[in-house]
């Protein structure tokens, strides 16, 4: 994701100016507390953007813009960070902030549908309809409310979060759905950022609270979703979230066939309908067909079509391996085929062949956030470590942690933030953000994971887009 606005722009700190092949600034943690202290310093900085209301708390950096409630870059994502702080530290103060943030989200999720708010989200990304989706829209708020209901299950607040999440579900089933040839849909884009993510939210809602009628709705939406897959002349089936009228195709997780395959795997898991498993396999065939060999392994290009086709390889969550690796990981739990572990190994090899995580490249520019950089990579490789205990995955995640610590900017008051380039095509423009996918909240959450890993008590409850075990294999 590369939006055009820049919040609190800064001159590049030493080591964070972009150059291909250049090493990122790094600092190796001496003990587990280094990770926790960095995360707590980030919390102090995020807290400076806190706004109290009678209905709860929201966080906002730029008062001239509409309040961003999204999971991706707004208040719901910051509330999710406070949930994680609560789970890791047990702090009553952080628990109260999480509750207040969730309460505000529960009361105001419909604000994302207001014309000014919807235009703000859609125009910022240049993708009409993202305000309806999961990451940047209503569904993402719902996912965080589900997590809040789980974390605070023994609290009276849990019922409030459950009711709000179910209201969001009814918004999707009763208000905003359109009728297609075989079932309901919303934006017409299969991307996980759009309709694919809405369906993941509905699956999470069904599995958390139970509702047979909702399951039948999901089945109908799944039948419609299959219509968006097209036989590719390259091989396999392609779900192009960029849109059928665009001259290019994004194959990776949040927009492309990797994300669609991931959703289809979940649809197979909850319905048992073998059509979904077969089409998910065909998505993998497409990804295999467009993968580009590296000195070691393979990588999927950021984009198919255009002058830079097959030349730029993102390594983060949205268009890169940190997201795409989730597809073969989930498939490996459902389909007894060695191709899935092979795919994981090849993509990891390809990333290291480009110099990751220590060195900058066209697809890992001077950025460290959860969406595009090291925070998202560390999270995914920690997840892989939870599956098989491979020292390789743990070491890769720790190396990413070195970059997160090394690129941190500490302020005079002891708080900390991360200046980095949001836009790949403008690496000279740095900003410091608070969001989960695009800023300090997500980076600090990954640091909490590394803290628990080093303390040998790793436990990470996961959202539905996150297929890894909650704890390492013992």
Model-derived features with residue positions:
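Glycan-recognition and catalytic cores of secretory/periplasmic carbohydrate-active enzymes
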Residues: 1-474
